Design a protein with these regions (language model features):
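DNA polymerase processivity clamps
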Residues: 1-93, 112-221
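Long, charge-dense
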Residues: 96-116
């Protein structure tokens, strides 16, 4: 079998959440960060023929790049054979017990208290601003009738910040994320936030959804 560019893009992103991954037979991909504060799940076009673990996903993907059009053979229980023309690589599976894996049960938000659409350009600008100004926090703030996304240093009242209005609200709230936890592929997202400090980012172009925990100092009135 071959992996599509779309699947490779997802796997590269998943490697930033957790360097290891346990693939499951079928077309579902799921991963969770070692700290268990980011969970991602996606559906891919390929049907994986077996369960197998990869300890260093980034290394595995870089190995695939040694081939222009790699064919993956999963006949062996211990490794995958990567072939193209006269070249081939043998890549051994990892013991599943050494991989931090998501719970089998699907994630359901306990409540759905705030929702908005985050467009591609808005996400890009927020993350660029956070990098330029070296800001560690992303806050979803509801006040004065609008929902704003703000990158800032919430511990420093005199820090630079950058904000974008993404919707309207009648509520007052301040949900805080660590910018380093916004490990999502570029694109537009339907975002839903629970006051129980869990959020869902559903990509509108890829079949991928992220569940990201918020900081305990978040507020919701």
């Amino acid at each position: 079998m071959k992996l599509s560019d779309k699947t490779l893009t997802l796997l590269k992103n998943f490697s930033s959440i957790n360097q290891s991954i346990l693939f499951k037979e079928g077309s579902s991909l799921r991963t969770i960060s070692v700290m268990k504060n980011i969970l991602a799940e996606a559906t891919i076009e390929e049907e994986l023929p077996r369960d197998f673990g990869i300890y260093d996903l980034n290394q595995f993907l870089n190995g695939l790049n040694l081939h222009q059009n790699a064919e993956l053979d999963f006949e062996n229980n211990s490794y995958v054979m990567i072939r193209e023309g006269k070249t081939k690589s043998k890549y051994f599976f990892a013991d599943p017990s050494v991989i931090v894996t998501p719970p089998d049960k699907s994630i359901v938000l306990p409540t759905e208290d705030v929702s908005f659409t985050l467009e591609t350009k808005e996400l890009d600008k927020l993350l660029k601003a956070a990098a330029i100004y070296q800001l560690p926090d992303l806050s979803v703030i509801g006040e004065a009738g609008v929902v704003r996304l703000v990158v800032r240093d919430k511990k420093n009242d005199t820090s630079n910040d950058f904000s974008i209005v993404v919707g309207e609200t009648e509520g007052e709230f301040g949900f805080n994320f660590k910018v380093e936890n916004i490990k999502i592929i570029p694109g537009s997202y339907e975002v839903v936030i629970s006051s129980k400090l869990l959020s869902r980012f559903k990509n509108t172009g890829f079949d991928v959804t992220y569940y990201i925990a918020m900081e305990p100092d978040s507020t919701f009135n």
